Structures are given as C-alpha cells and as structure tokens.
Amino acid sequence: MEAWECLEDFSAVRNLLEQSSNSTSWFWRFLWGSSQAKLVCRIKEDYKWEFEELLKSCGELFDSLNLGHQALFQEKVIKTLDFSTPGRAAAAVAFLSFIKDKWSEETHLSGGYLLDFLAMHLWRAVVRHKNRLLLLSSVRPAIIPTEEQQQQQEEARRRRQEQSPWNPRAGLDPRE
C-alpha cells in the first residue's frame, strides 16, 4: 500500500477527494492533478454503473446525510470500505468521490462541508485499518513452556548468575 500512504494524512486525503471530484475541471486535473487523482477519476468513470447500484442499495442515504445523521453512512458505506490492497483502496476513494459528486447535486450543504465530511470519514477509516493491521501483527500466540523447558531455563539462569562477575548480593548477608 506504499502507493496510497498519502491516505494517512488528512490534508492529502482532502486534496485527493477534491481533485478527483467533478468540481475540478479535467483540464486542471490534467495539468496539475496528481496521478492518484487521475486514477481515481478513471476508476470512478469505469465503475459508474456499479457505484450507482451500490447507492441504490443504501436507500435514503442522502436524505439522512442532509439531516445530519451519520449512522446509515457509517453502517452502509464506511464499514464496508476495504483497504487491503492498493486497488481496493483506490476503489474506496473512487466510491467516496462518486458519493461526493452525487451528494453535491442533491443538497443544500456547501461543497466544503461535503469535502471535509467525506475526507474525515475516509481518513479515519484508513487510520483504523492501519491500526488494526498493526495490532494483529503484534499479537503472537502465547507459548506455554513445558516443565522440562522451565527447568532448563531455570538452570541456564542460575549458570549465568554464577558465571557473572557482578554479584548483586555482594556485601549483603550470606544466603541461608
């Protein structure tokens, strides 16, 4: 996912969504847009019909968003985004860019609010995915040593203490 490490920075996510939305002209995107924004636009155009079908399955998503309710958006959209591969991450960004374009046609809310709202949720989903991966990679199964292994470890510890030139009990009362 090295190609999409920019998704870990909120301002980069916001810029990517802004550059890949229909509010940015293709000419500006062609001259100054990032390669990722161009890729997201291409994915958005290629999968337009699939994205339309996904939005139809979400029911009254835009009505609830216009009223300020986020629960449906969280359940139906954000929790289903997949960032396991660079291609899936690009598709997730393209889907949110598609949602921004459709939502801006049907709302009274400002474009800046839409952009901030979607960028914040996308960024949080990426960070949550990364933290989940880090947590899973750090969890190791507990290895319970057998009695024989415990005895071997204890003997090895005693030998190291005896061979050590530094004696932590030096100057103390002798052992009984």
Swiss-Prot record:
Protein name: E1B protein, small T-antigen
Entry's Gene Ontology cellular component terms: host cell nuclear lamina; host cell plasma membrane; membrane
Subcellular location: Host cell membrane; Host nucleus envelope; Host nucleus lamina
Region of interest (Disordered), ranges: 146-176
Membrane in keyword set: yes
Pfam families according to UniProt: Adeno_E1B_19K
Keywords: Apoptosis, Early protein, Host cell membrane, Host membrane, Host nucleus, Host-virus interaction, Inhibition of host apoptosis by viral BCL2-like protein, Membrane, Modulation of host cell apoptosis by virus
Coiled-coil annotated spans: none
Functional description taken from the UniProt entry: Putative adenovirus Bcl-2 homolog that inhibits apoptosis induced by TNF or FAS pathways, as well as p53-mediated apoptosis. Without E1B 19K function, virus production is compromised because of premature death of host cell. Interacts with Bax protein in cell lysates.
InterPro entries xref list: Adenovir_t-Ag_E1B_19kDa, Bcl2-like
Family (UniProt): Belongs to the adenoviridae E1B 19 kDa protein family.
GO BP term (any one): symbiont-mediated suppression of host apoptosis
Annotated PROSITE patterns: BCL2_FAMILY (PS50062)
Keyword Membrane: yes
Main location as per UniProt: host cell
